[in-house]
A protein has these predicted regions:
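Generic C-terminal helix-cap and adjacent flexible tail
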Residues: 199-209
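Two-component histidine phosphotransfer core
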Residues: 1-184, 188-196
Length: 209
């Protein structure tokens, strides 16, 4: 049975969120605390919303924004993001948590509170190898991918980026070989993840939500 990125309860995430709220209140940053709770509510509502395995690109990017905004409150003046969705891509359905996995990977491996982080996400309708579909690119200015991962990806290794390897293999199961997930390093620094999903009628293995 095909199972797509089953939601796992991560106690440390919730404990960190509670600690952050407590810290904001202690620092008398009451408005930030209220905003944090609002973004956290949006984030959790998405996580626990029904059993759908697919959502629109617009829904997924809104969820990613909630996560980034939580980090912006926690680390003020250190994070910038820009999302640009091409016209006609907003309502295309994609696997739920697809982009969340990529964005969370940035904060797990490419973010240091001492350095300013920029995140860019864009979408476009393109054709690859004669197949039309949706291309999504997520880029940051963090530390980038280690050379050994660039050389071995998508083979699963103990490099801390197992989530991206799992994502690649999951997309192959859902869409077949027409789907792709490529990783590279941006210039002058940072990581880039490019995902291509074929149009619905081209799915080799359509996902049923």
């Amino acid at each position: 049975e095909l199972r797509y990125l089953q939601l796992q309860i991560r106690p440390h995430f919730y404990l960190n969120a509670i600690t952050t709220i407590s810290s904001l209140i202690y620092q008398d940053r009451k408005q930030d605390a209220r905003s944090f709770i609002d973004f956290l509510s949006d984030y959790l509502r998405y996580l626990f919303s029904g059993s759908d395995t697919q959502v629109t690109l617009q829904q997924e990017t809104k969820h990613c924004k909630s996560f980034i905004q939580l980090q912006q409150i926690k680390y003020p003046d250190t994070i910038f993001y820009m999302f640009e969705l091409a016209s006609g891509t907003e309502n295309i359905r994609i696997p739920k948590f697809l982009l969340q996995t990529v964005v969370e990977n940035i904060f797990k491996h490419g973010f240091s509170p001492e350095q300013f982080l920029s995140i860019f996400l864009e979408s476009a309708l393109e054709e690859q190898n004669g197949v039309r579909g949706l291309r999504m690119t997520v880029e940051d200015n963090g530390c980038g991918f280690p050379p050994e991962m660039l050389a071995s990806f998508p083979v699963k290794e103990d490099n801390g980026h197992v989530g991206l390897s799992n994502l690649y293999h999951t997309l192959q199961l859902i869409y077949g070989p027409a789907a792709s997930l490529h990783i590279s390093n941006a210039e002058p620094n940072g990581a880039r993840v490019t995902i291509f999903l074929p149009e619905e009628e081209n799915h080799a293995h359509p996902s049923r939500g």
